[in-house]
């Protein structure tokens, strides 16, 4: 019997108590109330599910409508363990002082809002300028589940590292920002390119076409080819069809033992069975930059999805840097801090630049 429960957990509402009652005086913005699920894809395209936290309607006996609500004490405890990276920015700056910061950023839900149509997940010009500003002072990488070319088309910054397909397609900057070379540790002239899953391209392409055919009957579904992995989006699918979609995808993948299935935010991910993930990409990039084995590096990884947890765990195991989860609801995470949405990510990046330019004075004022 298919276990759908695990596939719904990331979209379920996990906090149902007023945050003000649990804050104890700390500065943490209130969580948004759950939004109603939109079943028509055209209607959904005009709305943004900012947190992926809408109520989850279910196929009876399969996908649960809500996760168990947390108590005020549980919410308070979660916030103690994962405070706002903005409210506690001075602590972040103190931990990074005297060390070389390296910035890793997820794309969807981190630099851009989560939208119904993944092809319209545009980042704002203000966010692009914030990322460009960070890249002038710190080595900066985009680590995304997207195809590397697609995420580059969204970001449009040549001075960054890009790790697409959940880190399975990596390439270095094609241009340098004014101060970027000063921070680069890779050998001059060396092109950083790495594709650990290249042998899987034929089978991934085959499965892509099979899934396109199988999903054709499910209105609102979208199969995205991310080169070294595939994504089946169901954000625009009627909730009554979620179980059907899940079953069809699983039936296809069962015939391909070299592939595995995982869950993102209203998306099913198909990836090669290979010991490589976003955490592996983070380690590879740090090594490429010459930081392997050094204790004066401070990696900062910001992401919103469960696939980013691999990177958060790597940082915890290293005992260096911090992971920041972008979320509006409490959830299990290895990240140390939180930000609520892309606008807060933008503000955090701007603050990083300020302390680089102004030192401790950058902590004062907006």
Curated annotation (Swiss-Prot):
Instruction: State the Pfam families in the record.
Output: Trehalose_PPase
**Reaction(s) catalysed by this chain's protein:** alpha,alpha-trehalose 6-phosphate + H2O = alpha,alpha-trehalose + phosphate
InterPro entries (UniProt xref): HAD-like_sf, HAD-SF_hydro_IIB, HAD_sf, OTSB-like, Trehalose_PPase
Q: What is its EC number?
A: 3.1.3.12
Q: Which cofactors does this gene product need?
A: a divalent metal cation
Q: Please list the GO terms describing molecular function.
A: trehalose-phosphatase activity
Q: Which GO terms describe its biological process?
A: trehalose biosynthetic process
> Part of which pathway?
Glycan biosynthesis; trehalose biosynthesis
Keyword terms, alphabetized = Hydrolase, Stress response
Which top-rank group of organisms is this from?
A: Eukaryota
User: What does the UniProt function comment say about this protein?
Assistant: Removes the phosphate from trehalose 6-phosphate to produce free trehalose. Trehalose accumulation in plant may improve abiotic stress tolerance.
The record's family statement is: Belongs to the trehalose phosphatase family.
Q: What NCBIfam families does the database record attribute to this sequence?
A: HAD-SF-IIB, T6PP
* Name assigned to this protein: Probable trehalose-phosphate phosphatase 3
Q: What species is this protein from?
A: Oryza sativa subsp. japonica (Rice)
Taxonomic classification: Eukaryota, Viridiplantae, Streptophyta, Embryophyta, Tracheophyta
Quote the gene name from the UniProt entry.
Answer: TPP3
């Amino acid at each position: 019997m298919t276990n759908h429960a695990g596939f719904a957990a990331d979209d379920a509402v996990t906090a149902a108590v007023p945050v003000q009652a649990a804050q104890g005086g700390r500065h943490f913005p209130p969580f948004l109330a759950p939004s109603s699920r939109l079943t028509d894809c055209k209607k959904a395209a005009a709305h943004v599910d900012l947190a992926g936290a809408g109520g989850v309607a279910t196929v009876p006996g399969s996908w649960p409508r809500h996760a168990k609500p947390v108590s005020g004490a549980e919410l308070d405890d979660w916030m103690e363990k994962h405070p706002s990276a903005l409210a506690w920015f001075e602590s972040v700056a103190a931990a990074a002082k005297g060390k070389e910061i390296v910035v890793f950023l997820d794309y969807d839900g981190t630099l851009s809002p989560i939208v119904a149509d993944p092809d319209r997940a545009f980042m704002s010009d203000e966010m692009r300028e914030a990322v460009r500003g960070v890249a002038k002072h710190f080595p900066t990488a985009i680590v995304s589940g997207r195809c590397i070319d697609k995420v580059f088309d969204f970001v449009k910054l040549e001075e960054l590292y890009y790790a697409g397909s959940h880190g399975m397609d990596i390439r270095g900057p094609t241009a340098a920002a004014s101060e970027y070379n000063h921070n680069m540790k890779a050998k001059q002239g060396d092109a950083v390119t790495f594709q650990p899953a290249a042998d899987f391209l034929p089978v991934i392409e085959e499965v892509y076409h099979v899934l396109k055919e199988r999903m054709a009957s499910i209105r609102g579904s979208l199969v995205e080819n991310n080169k070294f992995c595939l994504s089946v989006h169901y954000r625009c699918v009627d909730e009554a069809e979620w179980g059907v979609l899940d079953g069809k995808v699983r039936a296809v993948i069962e015939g391909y033992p070299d592939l595995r299935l995982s869950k993102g935010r209203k998306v099913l991910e198909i990836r090669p069975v290979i010991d490589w993930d976003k955490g592996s990409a983070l380690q590879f990039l740090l090594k490429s930059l010459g930081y392997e084995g050094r204790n004066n590096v401070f990696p900062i990884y910001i992401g919103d999805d469960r696939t980013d947890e691999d990177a958060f765990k790597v940082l915890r195991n290293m005992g260096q840097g911090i992971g920041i989860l972008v979320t509006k609801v409490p959830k299990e995470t290895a990240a140390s801090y939180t930000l609520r949405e892309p606008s807060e990510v933008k503000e955090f990046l701007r603050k990083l630049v300020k302390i680089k330019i102004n030192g401790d004075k950058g902590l004062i004022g907006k």
